Amino acid sequence: MMDLDNIPDTQTEAEELEEVVMWLIINSGQARSLAYAALKQAKQGDFAAAKAMMDQSRMALNEAHLVQTKLIEGDAGEGKMKVSLVLVHAQDHLMTSMLARELITELIELHEKLKA
């Protein structure tokens, strides 16, 4: 991972930032996919599998959130970081994944109550 204390000034550093942003997209997308897979398992009544998938989803989301935190710390609200479309896209992925996980957690709990 790149040193986020030094925001990119060169093409190589910009490419490194793009790699970090892609890592954010990949992890947040993985978190969302695992959450939806967990919901599918819950609908089928396999709550142990659903819990395991939600745990994996949480870990992927934690990885994505860590990357986001480092990006924010690197900028420190000073506007050092150039905002690109891919960075906005990454933030969108993260936020929708967080929301999906929260809602899917509630849906799984409802399925458990209905099956009880």
Can you annotate each of these PLM segments?
Residues 2-116:
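Terminal alpha-helical segments
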